[in-house]
Amino acid sequence: MATRSAKIDQKADLIWAIADKLTGVYKPHEYGDVILPLTVIRRFDCILSDTKDAVLQKYDEVKNLPMKDILLRKASKKDFYNTSKYTFERLMDDPDHIEENFREYLNKFSANVRDILEKFKFDGHITTMANKGILYIVLKEYTTDRGNLHYETQRIFL
C-alpha cells in the first residue's frame, strides 16, 4: 500500500499531467477552471462505481415513477446517482463521440450534482476542449491509476 506522501505525489502528478494537456489551449491561470470541475466529476464517478450496475438496473424499473429519485438514491447508497451507461472508463471506448457522450454522462447525474456542476460554468470548457481536440486526452488522464479518486484516496486530505 502506498504511503500518504506517495498518494499525494501521485495526485500532484495527475494535476501536472492534465495541465500539460491544457497548455496552448488555456492560460496557466485558467487551468483550475478545467481541473477542479473535472476532478470533482471524477470523484463522483469513482464514488458511484460500486453501485453503477444496480442504479442502471433500478433506473430501468423506475424511470417513469414519480418517486424515482428516492429509489435511485437508495440503489446508489448515496445522496446522488448517475443513470448514464457511461463512466470515465466507458467514455474512452468512443473517442469520436467524446463530447456528445460526456455531455450525456453529465446530464444523467441527479439534480443535486447537476446543480453543483452548473455552478462551475464548465459547459463552455467542454466545447473548447472538444474543438481543440483535447477533451478525450484530458479525460483519459483521469482513467489512469493516478486518476483513481475512489474512497481510499480521501485519506490524502486528512
Segments the model singles out, each with a brief description of its role:
Residues M1-L158:
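Non-catalytic, mostly N-terminal accessory regions of nucleic-acid modification and defense proteins
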